[in-house]
Regions:
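N-terminal secretory signal peptides that target proteins for export/translocation
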Residues: 1-16
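Alpha/beta-hydrolase active-site loop
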Residues: 193-215
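Bacterial N-terminal signal peptides
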Residues: 20-33
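Non-catalytic accessory segments of hydrolases
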Residues: 36-199
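Serine-hydrolase catalytic core recognition
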Residues: 121, 214, 228-231
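Short, well-ordered alpha-helical packing segments
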Residues: 157-161, 205-212, 238
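Alpha/beta-hydrolase fold nucleophile elbow
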Residues: 219-230
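Glycine-rich nucleophile elbow surrounding the catalytic serine of serine-hydrolase chemistry
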Residues: 230-239
Length: 239
């Protein structure tokens, strides 16, 4: 069922292991659909580096969806390395997934669900315990670097979070917007002293940096992060 499934610990970070049951649950959950039932919701608030966000808690798991981890890669930021996100205005309700990055429409991702302003991630966190930090798992979706999105139901992280893990999924630029190479872009990047090409992989790195800076707010341990992915997502892990 899984063409290339790779799990990797971030180097020199971890002191405790992600529970084996959580790894198994992650694999099984991403081979089938996992949905949280909308009963008994509460609305927790969390302060992150860009402002305050409000999530939804169901069955002991808090969900925060569509969180920008980088500025919209449009206009002068198209075909550029990801830049920091702007501060939030007021309390942001993180109830909806962000749009998918542009790609050929499919049964999984419709055209009206896409936007170039797509660099968002989602966090599912178990109930926080004072003095305790939960291990973190970050998922890179597959799709040949041409399609896929974190909003797809198969990537819902609720069930994994019930195993005591903070679960993160994310979008990254795809196709010609994520992996376009051209001599002019190379020259411009060299003149500016910034990275060029493989923008989708740079997005993944930016998301991991966001996790390092912010995951404690959700009860996660930034020194205990596992990245994993399937197909193109597995290649991203290896990269």
């Amino acid at each position: 069922l899984i063409s290339l499934f790779v799990s990797k610990r971030l180097p020199a970070l971890l002191h405790s292991e992600v529970p084996a049951t959580a790894i198994a649950a992650a694999i099984l959950a991403f081979c089938g659909t996992a949905f949280a039932l909308p009963f008994g919701k509460t609305y927790p608030e969390v302060a992150i580096e860009t402002g305050h966000i409000e999530g939804q808690a169901t069955e002991g798991v808090e969900a925060y969806l569509g969180l920008p981890y980088a500025a919209p890669p449009i206009g002068p930021l198209r075909w550029r390395a990801p830049q920091p996100p702007a501060p939030l205005k007021g309390l942001k309700q993180a109830f909806q997934f962000g749009p998918a990055c542009p790609q050929i429409p499919s049964k999984d991702v419709k055209l009206d669900e896409m936007s170039e302003d797509c660099l968002t991630l989602n966090v599912w966190a178990p109930e926080r315990r004072p003095g305790k930090r939960a291990p973190v798992m970050v998922w890179f979706h597959g799709g040949a670097f041409e399609n896929g999105a974190s909003r797809m139901p198969i990537y819902d992280g609720h069930n994994i979070a019930t195993h005591g893990v903070v679960m993160v999924t994310l979008n990254y630029r795809l196709g010609h917007l994520g992996f376009f190479g051209h001599p002019q872009l190379t020259e411009e990047a060299a003149a500016e002293g910034v990275p060029t090409a493989n923008y989708g992989l740079l997005d993944q790195i930016a998301a991991l940096q966001w996790v390092q800076r912010n995951i404690q707010a959700f009860g996660g341990d930034p020194s205990n992060v596992t990245i994993f992915g399937e197909s193109a997502g597995g290649i991203g892990v290896l990269a």
